[in-house]
Design a protein with these regions (language model features):
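Non-catalytic pre-domain segments flanking phosphatase-related domains
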Residues: 1-20
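Mg2+-dependent phosphoryl-transfer enzymes with acidic/Ser/Thr/Gly-rich catalytic loops
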Residues: 8, 13, 33, 181-260
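Residue-level marker for buried hydrophobic side chains located in beta-strands
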Residues: 18-20, 73-74, 205
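Active-site phosphate-binding/coordination module
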Residues: 29-126
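Short, structured coil segments at secondary-structure junctions
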Residues: 68-69, 77, 160, 218-219, ...
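Conserved acidic, metal-coordinating active-site core of Asp-based
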Residues: 113-218
Length: 260
């Protein structure tokens, strides 16, 4: 059972690393508000390591790692991470360029079937900057689809042998045995020089939706912003704590308690 977020619990956890989702966790109503962006800077200036973990595309992640106060970004649901090594941007992918090209060709078949069989669905507007997956929009730029339509989209991916995960705005699908948590493990071992099982003792994860459940499972300390509440009954693994506020305001609430 998730608990209300409390600064005393966070203090005892001795947190140094913040892994956070972006959409509806850092953002509010599709925008990164000033208070949440300031909270990122407050964490950075206090010495925390910040790693966004998102389903957003490679093109967005390039900008995020260059312009936000973060140490790395894990994108497209674990397909890669970007970080700086010194002054040079480093990109780590789970597969080769040839494999990515072949997978995109297979995903185009899924795209055609989804658009034909699920009226009202659309390819996500950020698809043109994606390298690993296919994102189907069910509420970002289209009228919100119902749960049955979302489940139908997932089943089409799975019928084609692809992995499918539901975020707060998209159904993301891809080919390959990877996830957000698998790339978090790779990042910890490669860039931090320690296994995730050691890093997680001083780390927390922040999220808002069912595709964050593996991270809720594997992190010792996890936080759900309050909009996670509508999904809780469907989650086997729930966040340790829940904020009072939604989205970016919930993230700010968390940061204020961390820095108290």
């Amino acid at each position: 059972m998730s608990k209300q977020l409390d600064s005393a619990d966070l203090e005892s956890a001795n947190i140094k690393f913040i892994f956070t989702d972006i959409d509806d966790t850092l953002t509010m109503h599709g925008q990164l508000k000033a208070n949440a962006y300031k909270a990122l800077w407050d964490l950075k200036n206090a010495g925390f390591k910040i790693i966004p973990v998102t389903g957003r595309p490679a093109g967005w992640c390039e900008m995020i790692v260059r312009f936000w106060p973060v140490d790395a970004v894990i994108g497209e649901n674990g397909g890669f991470y970007f970080c700086f090594r010194g002054k040079k941007l480093f990109r780590k992918f789970v597969n080769s360029e040839d494999e990515r090209t072949a997978n995109q060709q297979k995903l185009k078949k899924i795209e055609s079937e989804v658009l034909e069989k699920v009226p009202g669905s659309a390819v996500a507007s950020d698809q043109f900057t994606r390298l690993m997956d296919l994102a189907i929009d069910f509420c970002e730029d289209v009228p919100a689809l119902g749960d049955n339509d979302i489940k139908r989209i997932v089943s089409i991916y799975e019928d084609h042998g692809a992995v499918a995960k539901v975020s707060s705005i998209h159904v993301n699908g891809w080919y390959g045995d990877y996830s957000k948590i698998s790339m978090i493990r790779t990042y910890c071992e490669t860039e931090l020089g320690k296994p995730f099982d050691e890093i997680k003792k001083q780390a927390l994860f922040v999220g808002d939706s069912p595709n964050d459940e593996p991270s809720f499972e594997h992190f010792q300390t996890s936080v759900g912003v309050s909009n996670i509440s509508r999904f809780l009954e469907d989650l086997k693994f729930k966040p340790t704590f829940i904020t009072k506020s939604e989205g970016g305001d919930g993230f700010v609430e968390l940061v204020e308690k961390l820095l108290k």
